[in-house]
């Protein structure tokens, strides 16, 4: 049974699509960044020859640059995940289905989808208990050695492609960072009226702030070292209180100033989105007795924390690894307008200018919140 694939001028949502050469954004252990030919080839996209059972071919439209993408480029690793050869980046993507294997019935050519960037084994305990983010054999796109989504075309299992209807391509790509925040909210168990601290006004911190606000956190405080990022936080969430972190202060001193921003109330839950040792320590010092510090951010392999402060105050410390079962919820939140990410994309680049896009994302002076790469016109 041969795959059902696009022709040289395939139809999708009523318009002809020409298949261009497939190119991708690569890095390597030498920290080079470049654009080169990628798989599947244009010929394979046209014929559907590379499609496996259960897969569809997606013409990627928009991909956001994540901090982890920049980290793999600059550092060559995140913990034990090491770039060992030529490696394609990107895992925040949405696009259009342009070819469907005959075994797939859930999607058809022309469907607009967001790509959940993992492939799991469906056999290990985490998979069988619904926590597939802990899959022992997971292939997470853009995490070495699995190539990422910063390409024009990609084959992906249909089960991990979520229909987004008329949602914009950019919002479809932003479902991935929203899923990170939702996973944190779900496990941190933020409740109506909880005083919530969000550490870090980067994309994940900002999305987490919006989620906490939607969940009824009150009061709500967000911290950062950047005045411009805090101003952006206030713009998209007027009721948040912003708190600029002063570099050089001890964690205990920082905690006291944070509690002052709460009006003397100690946070019940902290959504720590930086992974920075000093920020985690300050959050522990600031927490109420029986409070929780939930670490979403990615940090160093080993850090020091104020252990006895956490002990005598019974502060729960939890951590997060990616997400599971969040995408349908994320889609509903954006479609309904409960979460508005329309201002998040501050910079846009075509795929051909991806190197400049990465330089912009990595430059603190650029003012970038989310840099979006558009793979196709």
UniProtKB/Swiss-Prot annotation:
Q: Which CDD domains match?
A: sorbitol_DH
Give the cofactor binding note: Binds 2 Zn(2+) ions per subunit.
Cofactor(s) this protein requires: Zn(2+)
PTM details?
A: The N-terminus is blocked.
Q: How does activity depend on pH?
A: Optimum pH is 9.4. Active from pH 7 to pH 11.
Residues recorded as binding NAD(+), renumbered to this chain, are 203-204, 224, 229, 296, 320-322
Q: Which Gene3D superfamilies match?
A: Medium-chain alcohol dehydrogenases, catalytic domain (3.90.180.10), NAD(P)-binding Rossmann-like Domain (3.40.50.720)
- One Pfam family this sequence matches: ADH_N
What EC number(s) are associated with this protein in UniProt?
Answer: 1.1.1.12
Tree of life domain: Eukaryota
For this chain, the family text in UniProt reads: Belongs to the zinc-containing alcohol dehydrogenase family.
- Cross-referenced PANTHER family: L-ARABINITOL 4-DEHYDROGENASE (PTHR43161:SF12), SORBITOL DEHYDROGENASE (PTHR43161)
Question: What's the protein here called?
Answer: L-arabinitol 4-dehydrogenase
Q: Which gene encodes it?
A: lad1
């Amino acid at each position: 049974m041969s795959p059902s694939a696009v022709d040289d001028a395939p139809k999708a949502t009523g318009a002809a699509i020409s298949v261009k050469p497939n190119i991708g954004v690569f890095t390597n252990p030498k920290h080079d960044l470049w654009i080169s030919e990628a798989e599947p080839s244009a010929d394979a996209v046209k014929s559907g020859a590379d499609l496996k059972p259960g897969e569809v071919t997606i013409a990627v439209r928009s991909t956001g640059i994540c901090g982890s993408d920049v980290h793999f480029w600059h550092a060559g690793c995140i913990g034990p995940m090491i770039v060992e050869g030529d490696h394609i980046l990107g895992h925040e993507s949405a696009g259009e289905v342009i070819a469907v294997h005959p075994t797939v019935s859930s999607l058809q050519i022309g469907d607009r989808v967001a790509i959940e960037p993992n492939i799991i084994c469906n056999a290990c305990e985490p998979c069988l208990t619904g926590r597939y983010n802990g899959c022992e054999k997971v292939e997470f796109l853009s995490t070495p050695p699995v190539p990422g989504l910063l390409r024009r075309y990609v084959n992906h299992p249909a089960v991990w492609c979520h229909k987004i209807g008329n949602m914009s391509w950019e919002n479809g790509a932003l479902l991935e960072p929203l899923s990170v925040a939702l996973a944190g909210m779900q496990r941190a168990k933020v409740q109506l009226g909880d005083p919530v601290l969000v550490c870090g006004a980067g994309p994940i911190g900002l999305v987490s702030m919006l989620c906490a606000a939607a969940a009824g956190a009150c009061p709500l405080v967000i911290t950062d070292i950047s005045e411009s990022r805090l101003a952006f936080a206030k713009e998209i969430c007027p009721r948040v209180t912003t708190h600029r972190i002063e570099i050089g202060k001890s964690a205990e001193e920082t905690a006291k100033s944070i509690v002052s921003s709460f009006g003397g109330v100690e946070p019940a839950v902290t959504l720590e989105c930086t992974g920075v040792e000093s920020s985690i320590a300050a959050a522990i010092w600031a927490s109420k007795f029986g409070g929780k510090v939930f670490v979403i951010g990615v940090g160093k392999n080993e850090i020091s924390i104020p252990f006895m402060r956490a002990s005598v105050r019974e502060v729960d410390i939890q951590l997060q690894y990616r997400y599971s079962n969040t995408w349908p919820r994320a889609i509903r939140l954006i479609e309904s307008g409960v979460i508005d990410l329309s201002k998040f994309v501050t910079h846009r680049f075509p795929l051909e200018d991806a190197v400049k896009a990465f330089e912009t994302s990595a430059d603190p002076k650029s003012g970038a919140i989310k840099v979006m790469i558009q793979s196709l016109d």
